[in-house]
Amino acid sequence: MKYDVKAFELLSNEEIADGIFDMRVKNDELAPLAKCGQFTHVYVPSKTLRRPISVCDSENGVLRLVYQVKGEGTKIMSEMKKGEAVDILAPLGNGFNIEKGKRYCLIGGGIGVPPMLYTAKQTENPLVITGFRNKDLIILQDDFKNAGAELVLTTDDGSAGVHGFVTDVLKEKINEVDEVCACGPTPMLKAIAQVCKEFNKPCQISLEERM
């Protein structure tokens, strides 16, 4: 797998939900190498460790990185301005193995939702299930619809979409798909893996927790 450290030009860095930012960075050499399910390491000035951010999309030499402000490092990221050079190690990880002819169920929970957008664009008629704690944290719904996905929104508190968890919807619709790909918090992934085991469906998972 080829990856490298390069300076990306920051094109935009906008808040799209409460504490969630949409960063677009350009590098014609590395951006096209990204596969769905892969991630990046973003260098944050004054911080020793890079921040792992999943690839939300890659198109025309532009990487889209959607991230949540959780600490000082990502707060500094959120303050970066258009035109700055961003030091990024990319692309990293194995990504999802997508096979032609299969229908996939793509499940994202919280900040595990963004990598599912690029994955949806690489699949045919995917079923996408997104889960959020409440309506204030909902992101990327129009993007998934524009990608041609069958979309189901869930919220833990019922403030938008289906009241409940992504696994509730998965159990109802799992026989409509051939395989499941999921990204999100560990408890959610464990529950999804258990459902897939019960229904004898292949499952690929990607951890969204910070390394």
Regions found by a protein language model. Give the residues of each.
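FNR/FR-type flavoprotein reductase catalytic core
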Residues: 72-210
